Amino acid sequence: MGYNAIIVPAGGRARGMDWTIQTAAMRLHILKKGDAITMMRISKRCQAVTGSLTLEIDAKAKEMKARGLDVVGFGAGEPDFDTPEHIRNAAKDALDRGMTRYTPASGMLELKKAVCEKLRRDNGLSYQPQQIVVSNGAKHSLFNTFQALLDEGDEVIVPGPYWVSYPELVVMAGGVPVTVQAQEENNFKLSPSQIEAAVTDRTRAIVLNSPNNPNGFVYTRDELKAIGDIAIRHDLIIVSDEIYEYLVYDGAEHVSIASLSPELKERTIVINGMSKAYAMTGWRIGYTASPLHVAKAMTNFQSHSTSNPNSIAQWAALAALSGPDDQLKNMVAEFDRRRRRMVELINGIPGLSCKPPKGAFYVMMNISGLIGKKLDGVPVTGSMSFTELLLESKQVAVVPGIGFGADRYVRLSYATNMENIEKGLARIREFAASLQD
């Protein structure tokens, strides 16, 4: 006779128990195969959160590649370059020096000082180290921010199309994401009147992401000033995600909204990290710069959740911020070359189009001209069916726009080599041509 062993918390129930070992904390039951147990209940809070569609698509493409299929993946939200050598060497050196113990929960002082210097040098912002909280990636920094600032029912304006995690992070903090859709004809930028119309007496904050994922737009200084005026007038917090700040093209300029006035600085949480500019997505180092009382609240929260970020990754991040930026410049130049080619190829395909992005490494491809057409009798009804049909028939992975709140678009990343861009867009052309009315 076969048996299954499962752990049941004290007070749990299971049928068909043959033998029990009881401790103060738990009971171990050995059950006969096929016996039923009560399913653990998932909290309503967790049930309200959906998975990351971008990560799901990327995982699906990698799984297909592992099976030997020739998949062209345009889903990745990470540079395809290696972490620069001087950063890798700094991590090796930290290991050799035994820098493997706890650091302060909010990050080591040396790194926080380097972040302050970076903000002064590149953004014209003055912060003290105690105003910096280093976390396990910029996503974790955003998580801490919303946890520190939101109470149940507080509303957060999220411009759409938006990065998939913004609404979910707000929900996880008990807040209510209020999405306001920008239009392609306005370069996917919200107008001040759109933002003003979305403000209610429950509005607590607005999210800004410039340069933007998934659209690639970059707000100008004047546009940011207009948004800042609304924030001041309605006493709103600005959550400014600036993770793509160095990845700008065609003369676009990244401006941190916190640098526009002392009043805006006091109501802005600056979010940034190492992942995109330094090809360090797996190292997981992000940070916030904020008013001191907010930084203290986030530090307390983090001290009971993850404690400090990885110590070796912190030493690597210190080298990134204080070392040479030659590879960054080369990476931006290569992204620009790929960007121009991808835009050219997309706009040459009947039924598809895109606006040239000014930042990040994404293109939002408009699929409106193909909606309603069919492949072997199966209609393209929106971004999800487009994505599924394209992946199944041509082995090209893109991210459906529905995950960004824009169902008539799909997102393509040009953080891949030029060969893949040429091959993948050729397959997309074939796919579009194969669709029938």
Enumerate the language-model features and the residues they cover.
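PLP-dependent class I/II
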Residues: 3-7, 21, 25-42, 46, ...
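Generic structural signal for well-ordered alpha-helical scaffold segments
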Residues: 62, 116, 120, 146-147
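A glycine-/small-polar-enriched, mobile loop at the entrance of the PLP active site in fold-type I
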Residues: 75-80, 93-112
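Conserved N-terminal alpha-helix of the aminotransferase class I/II PLP-enzyme fold
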Residues: 102-135
